[in-house]
């Protein structure tokens, strides 16, 4: 029985999961994903829209009061980041020039020493995008999995690293504020906003089989966690939706409760990435060009989000999965030659 259940909850789409996929990210209007071969007969009913999650790192400066129309402004974002970095340095290192890379690492080591549950340790990981000329781009992944990137034009690799560290430090500091915790009041406010957005009724919020009910279940299950922690969990479900895996699980008769319970406690790992990459290999074989189109779209989204100072893990995981799929296709072609 458990073996059958585990098989139904696998992230892969399989041959029965092909169809039109929509990259509907929770709370964000997404662009259409790659279109695979449409099934014969009438198209299946689309999945119910996912209700919006709590406000997460919008405009790159969570909780920071910005003037009207300033959200997304590079100048305002840069000013906000510098202000937070200076404030953090003042309280931890005294006045003077800040080594923001060291400050970010020190912040997470301090969290760990105070009892934060960091399953993979407190190490902050940097990744430079290969390039022989500016602008240079750097990504930084925090211990919990959240990802940020250099948000400025960076003429050197060192500057790109500092830029990524600055935006990551700002979000790390803001994430400690009490207003960034999921509380009963926050849950009620978020669910009410979701009901208003989708013209739902209160009964839907209490039924875990509805989209809004599932959203409430997710919030309730993560009460006390921070926005970054919640976003890390939501990334798994965003990827499952983008890849068509949630639709495939419904076709395999998996209930919402089963899916939520299973993936709420499963970290995003190489097995999930590999299975999703295989799905994109299959799509590319059915519809040549689907993979390259989706990769180009994903790279544009990643760059736009990076320059806006937003959390990037969903976009970056998408890109990594698609690059993995392209590599698998290349290996298959080489072996056939």
UniProtKB/Swiss-Prot annotation:
BP-aspect Gene Ontology terms: autophagosome maturation
Biased composition (Pro residues): 39-56
Gene Ontology CC entries for this record: cytoplasm
InterPro entries in the record: Autophagy-related_EPG5, LIX1
Bias kind Low complexity: ranges: 26-38
Stretches for region Disordered: 1-64
Pfam family, one: LIX1
Annotated family: Belongs to the LIX1 family.
PANTHER family: ECTOPIC P GRANULES PROTEIN 5 HOMOLOG (PTHR31139), PROTEIN LIMB EXPRESSION 1 HOMOLOG (PTHR31139:SF6)
Protein name listed in UniProt: LIX1-like protein
Organism of origin: Homo sapiens
